[in-house]
């Protein structure tokens, strides 16, 4: 008899009970955490992470990473972010803004019990790859005890590998370009359930360089989300904030009332350096600071490469590195790692390393080229003096850049002092650079590209109060780079563009109307330039010269009408008509109607026509388009329902207009109606466009899913072995074929040709089944075969 059903006993009972208790305890802790967050006082003062209502995994991750004390931006921003509010965070460089948005990301997803099947929960955008890698490493440290899946999506890596894993990610740290590529191309990647959007260095991401990309990314995201914006120079433009659909954002600026926008322990200086002496002073500075860690910022990648290669050949006695956007991702990451770990080193870099990167113990920040604005200056000098450490920064300014740049820095509350360089400390490397460029053509070519890129970077700057290209000594600067002469630059010319544009018009007005032949020739030349005709082989044949020896000499001896010029005549002499018996007086075209008229009358009429009718007038009469400007404008009539004609734009009667009310009221009413109509039409158009994009994306993703499903089905096809269930009932097959004794007929078959043999054998095979009709026939056949 079977035992009665009852509660499980034994070794399996205790683990099940412990799992139930653990799940119940987790639910109680989660509800308690949610209640603590709701009761959080936003006006309170928080000094450590333990004062905040954080979950156990986040608190353990912060403690393991040795984060205990809160900075100003962290204490104010984290509390608002935990409440689910949108934030505009602004703080000085090196003040801990990364933790200010990573902690709320982990906490908000933890309280919502986010899992893998819930999809993407948080998206963190960074302007550069290096900053994205740094954010991802911090996220891995503090989130090590969470169960979320986090991913890093940047350019320079395999797109297919990212596509395979992207659908399982809960948190993504990415750059805008690669993120948009996945949103457009990856079929299994959806963002409809996104909870948080974070923009680090928000002013740079919302700048014109990323504007179209960021707008496209935001178009894929849901509007119901929490948005966090952080930067050292935060944007307050209404247009930028409207693009992000922020809902009552909290502006957290902890250093807005501070005396300076840069760290207090940062010593800032500037040096007036003429453009041709910049490399000499930079070389002298590096030689005198061999036991320090220095970052040198330049305006373009080609300048970085040239300065790095030339200084590397000169061997200053300190390790040199260079970083720019044209390098491959593996090399860039290796350079960032090596520079972070080194104690004494010089890094030449573009603005790719100007924002957000945390290099430990940087002593000097040198800005060899003037930054484009004060915000860029603040971010550059922020690579040193981080987390209350000391640091020094030096800005190299040309005399033409001093006044404008100092005015911009003063507006941003940047304290900076002027210093002078001792003349006996300077070392000139001009001759050495010339020698290297003479010996190495590649270095010379790189120097030319560096010169052009620098001039172009100055030319495209918007602030012309700072960047005055015409006041720069470009020839001397080219010589200081070791070049034999200044390279030609296409966009720099002596005349202004407007003057060049208006020059042909001014020249055309000066021409008199009597010079019809000159104008006609000029028009013909311009037409030839504008519309090049196709030249056939016959045209080329008749345009050939020197077809015989006397061709050029003979052309000098004849006039245009074919008559000969006297040998002893001057240059302006007429043809010698006495040499020929008959001479041509006048030529007529074939089929001319005026052949019967007298010659004198024709000559007089031709002269009169030439005086009265001009070439331009003839062309004007032949062109309908040119005659339209002398005609009046046409009128268009519109008929009402009763059949009465009205003008297309008919003015209303004054009495009817006054009867409808005051003019200002009518104007306000009309503007309100039109604004409402355009607003509704705009909303409808946007919704239609969005729906079309979504349908197109869904069709593409469905197609990709079908292709993936077909590929998986093809891969999973397996050939099963034959069913062996009925083989036991059957007789076992013989292991060997029975021996057959060939008769004389078989011998005859072997002797016959192959084509007869095959036909005969096929005939036998066809007739054999018909002869076997009874069991006796089968036995006789078997005995015959067995012999």
Curated annotation (Swiss-Prot):
A motif (Q motif) lies at residues 47-75. The keyword Repressor does not apply. ATP binds at residues 91-98. Residues 1-28, 494-542, 560-579, 586-618, 653-776 are annotated as: Disordered. It comes from the Eukaryota. InterPro entries: DEAD/DEAH_box_helicase_dom (IPR011545), Helicase_ATP-bd (IPR014001), Helicase_C-like (IPR001650), P-loop_NTPase (IPR027417), RNA-helicase_DEAD-box_CS (IPR000629), RNA_helicase_DEAD_Q_motif (IPR014014), SPB4-like_CTE (IPR025313). It is found in: Nucleus, Nucleolus. Residues 78-252 form the Helicase ATP-binding domain. GO terms for biological process: rRNA processing. Keywords: ATP-binding, Helicase, Hydrolase, Nucleotide-binding, Nucleus, Ribosome biogenesis, RNA-binding, rRNA processing. GO terms for molecular function: ATP binding; ATP hydrolysis activity; identical protein binding; RNA binding; RNA helicase activity. The keyword Lipoprotein does not apply. Its EC number is 3.6.4.13. The Q motif is unique to and characteristic of the DEAD box family of RNA helicases and controls ATP binding and hydrolysis. Belongs to the DEAD box helicase family. DDX10/DBP4 subfamily. Interacts with the U3 and U14 snoRNAs. Associates with pre-ribosomal complexes. This is ATP-dependent RNA helicase dbp4. It comes from Aspergillus fumigatus (strain ATCC MYA-4609 / CBS 101355 / FGSC A1100 / Af293) (Neosartorya fumigata). The gene is dbp4.
